[in-house]
Amino acid sequence: FTALAPDLYHGKVTTEPDEAGKYMMALEVGRATKDMSGAVDELVRRTGRAKVGAVGFCMGGGLALALAVARPDAVAAVAPFYGVIGWPDAAPDYASMTAAVQGHYAEHDDYAAPPASRALEAQLKDLGKEAEIFIYPGTQHAFFNDTRPEVYDADASRQAWDRIIPFFHEHLDS
């Protein structure tokens, strides 16, 4: 796969969690969606492939879903990790989304709690969308982040990755 990570913060970088939280809260979803859409166009141009996938973690998982709604012409598969669209003014209309969804969520998560992830799965399936949500027992938010040993779960991360690769091959290989 070819990967591209758009700079949604336009050059602002931090390793401090509090500062990162401030950046996240100030992010304009509409602008971020336009930036991601431009990244999709660039991937399509560079690879010559008409279909792309999106992966996002935490807020990025919600943004990956927003991108799939905004770009049904190109986003064929989306894999949010513990991400939901948590912005009241950004409630998506999933009816237009064509992407298959494979979500990966933690059992113990205040941001994307299991009821929210199950509600997302039900909402998508009610609309006839292909959606599968996995909730990893005993895990916490950010279980895939190996730079955070207090929450990282190697077994759950490996299991999630082993699910994502065939999922992307199924939906992105032409």
Residue ranges of predicted features:
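N-terminal cap/leader regions of alpha/beta-hydrolase-fold enzymes
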Residues: 1-174
